[in-house]
Amino acid sequence: MKQLSSAQVRQMWLDFWATKGHSVEPSVSLVPVNDPTLLWINSGVATLKKYFDGTIIPENPRITNAQKAIRTNDIENVGKTARHHTMFEMLGNFSIGDYFRDEAITWAYELLTSPEWFDFPAEKLYMTYYPDDKDSYNRWIEVGVDPSHLIPIEDNFWEIGAGPSGPDTEIFFDRGEAFDPENIGLRLLAEDIENDRYIEIWNIVLSQFNADPAVPRSEYKELPHKNIDTGAGLERLVAVIQGAKTNFETDLFMPIIREVEKLSGKVYDQDGDNMSFKVIADHIRSLSFAIGDGALPGNEGRGYVLRRLLRRASMHGQKLGINEPFLYKLVPTVGKIMESYYPEVLEKRDFIEKIVKSEEESFARTLHSGQHFAQGIVADLKEKGQSVIAGQDVFKLYDTYGFPVELTEEIAEEAGMTVDREGFEAAMKEQQERARASAVKGGSMGMQNETLQNITVESVFNHNASQLSSKLVAIVADNAEVEAVSEGTTSLIFAETPFYAEMGGQVADHGQILDESGKVVATVTNVQKAPNGQALHTVEVLAPLALNQEYTLAIDSNRRHRVMKNHTATHLLHAALHNILGNHATQAGSLNEVEFLRFDFTHFQAVTAEELRAIEQQVNEKIWEALEVKTVETDIDTAKEMGAMALFGEKYGKEVRVVTIGDYSIELCGGTHVGNTSEIGLFKIVKEEGIGSGTRRILAVTGKEAFEAYREQEDALKAVAATLKAPQVKEVPHKVEGLQEQLRQLQKENAELKEKAAAAAAGDIFKDVKEVNGHRYIASQVSVSDAGALRTFADNWKQKDYSDLLVLVAAIGDKVNVLVASKTKDLHAGNLVKELAPIIDGRGGGKPDMAMAGGSNQPKIQELLDAVAGKL
């Protein structure tokens, strides 16, 4: 077996499949593009779903890739086991309706055992297969596998909901008896017993059926086009090839672990408990790549996943004695390890480090808040005479504040308490089940549409025409090809079309289809790409249409031009965001509609008013400069040499269109654009908002819509001016400033009157002094409008020696507010208010000299006042 680095293993995989006629698909962003069913790209095949369900036919039906992926539904196992990871790489080879079982098995065996490639010892390989899949069993024997190395497994059938499914055959590497201390042998495989001896290195899925949950598996229909979908975990392959005890002792993780050793002063012991080292090494890889791909820590969705990973890694750093932000220092090491295939981490190093460090600092503050929350729980339990912290509270500390259960146990132990471990585990299990259910929902692929897949006639989109004559080459009605159609909604394909099919965030063209006499025979309401790339026109048929007849296709030119203005403005906006916010503010989604444009981009905070003004100003300046908009068609490599911005995660063919706007913007884009920025006229941002963790959205309008937006603002200002009796709109700010000054003066006078009223009322209240056990106290209900007035009473009370203790209660709205103030050390205001608050169904706390509580049971106010004496 060859000794190879991880980079060599990855490259050898891709090189082998290239010799078998496969196209190498580059690894795409971990953040899914145009796939709302996935939180993360979680497998090698996730980015190829559109090929497997027949939505799109690939240029080459043979594909190979090395795809980074994230899965976090089993995060608790990371660091505990030898092979669990949150981020991993899947090596894959795929056949979309091309070769099938025989070639897949033959080539897999060749790659693994040939001296030219990995050169695995054949006797170390074992294969599992689906019992009914005799073809796979026979093929393995034909390529030279000993029958004793073939294990039937009932679970070897891949399906997730409706869609492509089929048997799978897995390949395992036997690491020997040293990893089988109980000498169980092949039962480990046959009975699916968790073990470290037989390591799964490759799974080959033979996708040959359309799964239908409504029928038994034996009745699944065969796919019109059978597929091969395989996955081999790079980390596992590398561990086997490098003879590592676990995945973590490979060149993918050890450089990170060595850096953690330097930062902590601790030593990684390959035979000891190294969970903290492993967690940190794993999680910083996920964080570096995910942030580099545009995801940012937050409170929901993928942002919450990143926040949880960072906090878990940070806590494990503390276990190693690292009590300051340190994860950000590991980003360069991650980048260097992966640089040969993933240069983006080093390219975005500064941005990734900034986000990680900021989040670490934020977590330090959150941890402090969590400690206060934990102390509050302990205090409440002591008051109730209880000694077990509830599982739900332990889980909240874990989930909200990032407290590992061990830390909560330490706090409990110091207070002479314990934690409800079972309750915590139950709450944790509920969360994991929700995560798994969510992951399964997004996993299935759609059913293949055989009719559209079989339409292979050529159809060309003419970018420059608004009207042309073309032959009708396909009619699809009720999911079948027909020769003619006379009514209803149907789909048409023409040899050439001026209609733009919805793509790249640009909506489809609308328009009409006319016969030779000029009569409108159909209206086009939508255009989408068919699986083989043709423009599929959805039309309302007004008169008979026949196959192979010539028709005139005319787009709605006014509608198209309005969309073009918005699309070109989107490119200007993208460039302005880079210039003003930074290069990290890259496109995360867009929509170029008729009346507006919507642009989503990665950014870690709200865009300020000043930044929005600068962005809007810069876009308009480029419009007024009347920059020429040019498009050229070239190959992808030339386009990149030109400096064209490619959207990360988008797939591009061999030939691409490059759109340049003067020397201001250059992007790869297949959409339609104006010829000169002056055609846009005007650009206005109407809204900026957050739509998820680390993602912002700008809604903007151009041309007539922009003018109308400004007119609407002007009308609103004029209405305000009229109300303020300002002769001109420009005088409105001065008038408003005057009103604000008047308001401030009135508020000041009102506060002074309140103080005087409070002082007057206090004169009566402070006379009502009682005494219990040598403690002088005042307990009274007062009439105030807000809790702040209670503090004013307390401030007045502190000025003189009225009593040792003051208890004030006020009914404000439908709530009850309580203030307790103390002047002596033996009367703790915070403790007393906690004892009194439950009487009014409330809670409270505070310092020894002043504390407050809130409740809702107003009829119990007098009971609370009467209870004060009993507490002294």
Curated annotation (Swiss-Prot):
Keyword flag Hydrolase: no
GO biological process: one example: alanyl-tRNA aminoacylation
Catalytic activity annotation: tRNA(Ala) + L-alanine + ATP = L-alanyl-tRNA(Ala) + AMP + diphosphate
Record note on cofactor: Binds 1 zinc ion per subunit.
Coiled coil: none
Domain remark text: Consists of three domains; the N-terminal catalytic domain, the editing domain and the C-terminal C-Ala domain. The editing domain removes incorrectly charged amino acids, while the C-Ala domain, along with tRNA(Ala), serves as a bridge to cooperatively bring together the editing and aminoacylation centers thus stimulating deacylation of misacylated tRNAs.
Protein's name according to its UniProt entry: Alanine--tRNA ligase
Enzyme class: ligase
A GO MF label: tRNA binding
Residue positions binding Zn(2+): H567, H571, C669, H673
Pfam families associated with the record: DHHA1, tRNA-synt_2c, tRNA_SAD
Cofactors: Zn(2+)
Entry-linked NCBIfam families: alaS
GO cellular component: cytosol
Keyword Ligase listed: yes
Keywords: Aminoacyl-tRNA synthetase, ATP-binding, Cytoplasm, Ligase, Metal-binding, Nucleotide-binding, Protein biosynthesis, RNA-binding, tRNA-binding, Zinc
InterPro entries found in the cross-reference section: aa-tRNA-synth_II/BPL/LPL, Ala-tRNA-lgiase_IIc, Ala-tRNA-ligase_IIc_anticod-bd, Ala-tRNA-synth_IIc_core, Ala-tRNA-synth_IIc_N, Ala-tRNA_ligase, Ala_tRNA_ligase_euk/bac, DHHA1_dom
Entry EC number(s): 6.1.1.7
Annotated family: Belongs to the class-II aminoacyl-tRNA synthetase family.
Function: Catalyzes the attachment of alanine to tRNA(Ala) in a two-step reaction: alanine is first activated by ATP to form Ala-AMP and then transferred to the acceptor end of tRNA(Ala). Also edits incorrectly charged Ser-tRNA(Ala) and Gly-tRNA(Ala) via its editing domain.
Localization, UniProt: Cytoplasm
